Amino acid sequence: MNSDNNTKKETDERQKRNGSYGRNAGYNTRKQVNRSKNNKYRPQAKQNSRYQEKSAERYPEKNQDRQQKPVLKNSSRNSMNKNTGRNFQKQGRRGRRSSERLKIIPLGGLEQIGMNITAFEYGDSIVVVDCGLSFPEDDMLGIDLVIPDVTYLKDNISKVKGFVITHGHEDHIGALPYVLKDVNVPIYSTKLTLGLITNKLKEHNLVRSTKLKEVKHGQVINLGDFSIEFIKTNHSIQDASALAIYSPAGIVVHTGDFKVDYTPVFGDAIDLQRFAEIGRKGVLALMCDSTNAERPGFTMSERTVGKVFDNLFNEFHSSRIIIATFASNVDRVQQIINTAYRFGRKVAVEGRSMVNVISTASELGYLRIPENTLIEIDQVKDYPDDKVVLITTGSQGESMAALSRMAANIHKKITIKPNDTIIFSSNPIPGNEKAVSKVINELYMKGAKVIFQDAHVSGHACQEEIKLIYSLVRPK
């Protein structure tokens, strides 16, 4: 009997020490402790079943909510996106497995200039952003252009819902005629971009077999598990877009090629307000143009080039002026035409791609050409040198471009004269420096004046503009 009493006393004392008796019930001060960052010990509460039962009797609805409330691993799947009108909750009702993830698959364009193409995949849906080409390196003998490897798209063709194109530059649309032969799905983009794509498809007899869907800025399209919103941006071509890609896994913002230009030559400035609104919703990831990420400050406005042209036309008023630029830079062409008109010069256009772009932009209302300003290349010889401006391709030293053929004396209609002024209104794309230098040397040898500085501004954002977009979007 005495042994039983002693055992009971020892047990009671041990319970007191361990904190599971009397006033200290519910706390274990010896074992259940958390060490915080400042090295202080803090006791952790242990649930008391007696108090829990009383709480359940007094507040049955509160206890029921606590027990039945689900844990959402992906809250965006069960939310309504007000701007897109898309209810992602429907996808959860289809029995979508929690193991599914958003896949971002770059098929080109990373750590290189050109060949931009990225696939976004979720579940049974793939959306492809851009489909560009790049130009061959010096050691790629016999190669005219380089297109991306789309084997992954061909292997998953049943999932591919469409191409979404940010703007109409070759490094974003140039591979479409080749890729569409194996991956023929609809193409979604803005008006001018689709016009330029149509020109390329005509050359390959693919217009009838391709579905082209025009989208306006601010509009949202639904492609499988994705909803994609087009956002107005500025670039060295009009109708450029950024994309807000809504998926059950979250929002991805794809800037496309962009700059922040508050005084664009044509159209509105970049829609920074919309970037901020999307940022407040919560953005999973930001895919940003980084071409000029190593350049500090801001990119200058395209309008500043117009003033440079005015000064150059005034300085070289007595000579024939030939300007080489990118064919797709419609704003640059517009400023050249404006300056030529003010100085009483006629404008001739040379280079197949240049002629196609100017014709398309003019027909769609993106280029305003004063009456009786344009002349044919055959008519150049009928005008004095100080009354003519020639806009040509070849700013990148392409061997078969118009300016390169003029420099090599193999152009059929234009011969370089000692008094000519040649303006390079572009910067060499990395890798093209040698070819451009060769053309410049050949022009100098013929006695022409060559201007290759100060007549160009980039269409890509510098560091401060990238920081601005990042601060607005605030990706996770």
Each language-model region and where it sits:
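Proline-aspartate-enriched helix->loop->beta-strand connector
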Residues: 283-284, 318, 466-476
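A general structural motif
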Residues: 299-305, 392-408, 429-435, 455-464
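Structural motif
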Residues: 325-327, 352, 392-396, 425-429
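Redox- and metal-dependent alpha/beta enzyme cores, enriched for Fe-S-associated oxidoreductases
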Residues: 412, 416, 426-447
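His/Asp/Glu-rich metal-coordinating catalytic cores
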Residues: 90-164, 169-382, 403-415, 434-437
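Intrinsically disordered, low-complexity RNA-associated tracts
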Residues: 1-98
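Conserved acidic residues
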Residues: 161, 284, 388, 420, ...
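Generic long, charged, amphipathic alpha-helical segments
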Residues: 443-468
